[in-house]
Curated annotation (Swiss-Prot):
Keywords: 4Fe-4S, Electron transport, Iron, Iron-sulfur, Metal-binding, Repeat, Transport. SUPFAM superfamilies: 4Fe-4S ferredoxins. [4Fe-4S] cluster 1 binds at residues 8, 11, 14, 53. [4Fe-4S] cluster 2 binds at residues 18, 37, 40, 49. GO terms for molecular function: 4 iron, 4 sulfur cluster binding; metal ion binding. This is Ferredoxin-2. Ferredoxins are iron-sulfur proteins that transfer electrons in a wide variety of metabolic reactions. Residues 2-27, 28-61 form the 4Fe-4S ferredoxin-type domain. Its cofactor is [4Fe-4S] cluster. Pfam families: Fer4 (PF00037).
């Protein structure tokens, strides 16, 4: 699974990229539901959210 860190700028680039809808808007940053996140396995070669994040604030946990 992945997690969005405090460096998130709330740009929303990641949310529509998630094939399993694991990303949602939190109060100040976007949140990954780690119980839903599949690391895009079976969908993409790499996590889609990581690929589009302009500030590289999404980390593997």
């Amino acid at each position: 699974a992945h997690r969005i860190t405090e460096e998130c700028t709330y740009c929303a680039a990641c949310e529509p990229e998630c094939p399993v809808n694991a990303i949602s808007a939190g109060d100040e940053i976007y949140i990954v539901d780690e119980s839903v996140c599949t690391d895009c396995e079976g969908y993409y070669d790499e996590p889609a959210c990581v690929a589009v994040c302009p500030v590289d604030c999404i980390i593997k946990v």
